[in-house]
């Protein structure tokens, strides 16, 4: 039984990137994982992803870029106000304007950059740089 499927997918991406693999198969194909992958694709951390198995659980086929230095899931999922985003950026990202935090908000899953532009906070899910 898998307890944290987002963590499994993020770790699969990190391990495959370190080994130099170009694509991976990750499961299950949950909506939240798909939205996190979409944010990573928008910032060119992955080239593409698609659902390849529509059966129970499903699977993602993820094509990687070579730009991922590190990525991980943030646990526990801290609720963050817009004013406090900078504190968590300093904690999880190595430098200013290098990498993204992925958070879930009332407007959907987005990066810290988009959340700052909209002036909203949310719960931290992951970091990528």
Curated annotation (Swiss-Prot):
InterPro entries: Ribosomal_uS8 (IPR000630), Ribosomal_uS8_CS (IPR047863), Ribosomal_uS8_sf (IPR035987). GO terms for biological process: translation. Transmembrane segments: none annotated. GO terms for molecular function: rRNA binding; structural constituent of ribosome. The keyword Ribonucleoprotein applies. Gene3D superfamilies: 3.30.1370.30, 3.30.1490.10. Signal peptide: none annotated. GO terms for cellular component: ribonucleoprotein complex; ribosome. It comes from the Archaea. Keywords: Ribonucleoprotein, Ribosomal protein, RNA-binding, rRNA-binding. Pfam families: Ribosomal_S8. NCBIfam families: PRK04034.1 (NF003115). PANTHER family: 40S RIBOSOMAL PROTEIN S15A. Belongs to the universal ribosomal protein uS8 family. Part of the 30S ribosomal subunit. HAMAP family: Ribosomal_uS8_A. One of the primary rRNA binding proteins, it binds directly to 16S rRNA central domain where it helps coordinate assembly of the platform of the 30S subunit. This is Small ribosomal subunit protein uS8. It comes from Thermoplasma acidophilum (strain ATCC 25905 / DSM 1728 / JCM 9062 / NBRC 15155 / AMRC-C165).
């Amino acid at each position: 039984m898998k307890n944290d499927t987002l963590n499994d997918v993020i770790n699969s991406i990190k391990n495959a990137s370190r080994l130099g693999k170009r694509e991976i198969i990750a499961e299950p194909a949950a909506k939240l994982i798909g939205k996190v992958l979409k944010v990573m694709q928008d910032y060119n951390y992955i080239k593409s992803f698609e659902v390849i198995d529509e059966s129970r659980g499903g699977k993602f086929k993820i094509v990687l870029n070579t730009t991922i230095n590190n990525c991980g899931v943030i646990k526990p999922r801290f609720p963050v106000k817009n004013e406090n985003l900078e504190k968590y950026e300093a904690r999880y990202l190595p430098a200013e304007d290098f990498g993204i935090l992925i958070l879930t908000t009332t407007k959907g899953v987005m990066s810290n950059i988009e959340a700052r532009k909209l002036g909203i906070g949310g719960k931290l899910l992951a970091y990528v740089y």
